[in-house]
């Protein structure tokens, strides 16, 4: 859900004949994010201990991030600029690569092709390799459809 390989821990404790369920988790994440499978929610627990960066927010329907990014790139390239996108090395970098692949393969910026993309982070490059190595375990249906067509979702021509 939240990150590649993330998980929650469920524990059942019995004390004085009473059983209770305790759940430990990091941020669970949102549905409909690219690449990795949607989170599996735990339906009930007696106690929950968790971290949540955005726990107090309701997320609406997300925009088409590839289209939004293409607009920013077009504006930047039109002005003769370069775009630097800071991103967490696990998760966000791979999502950005996914969106950039879509921009290139869906011809959203043909007038500026070819444009170069650099990932200037050894950790992000290593994490991207790990994503690719564990695609069958963690990628969602949309990403697997691309893989089955011979397309790597987080790289591009």
PLM regions: where:
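His/Asp/Glu-rich metal-coordinating catalytic cores
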Residues: 1-95, 101-112
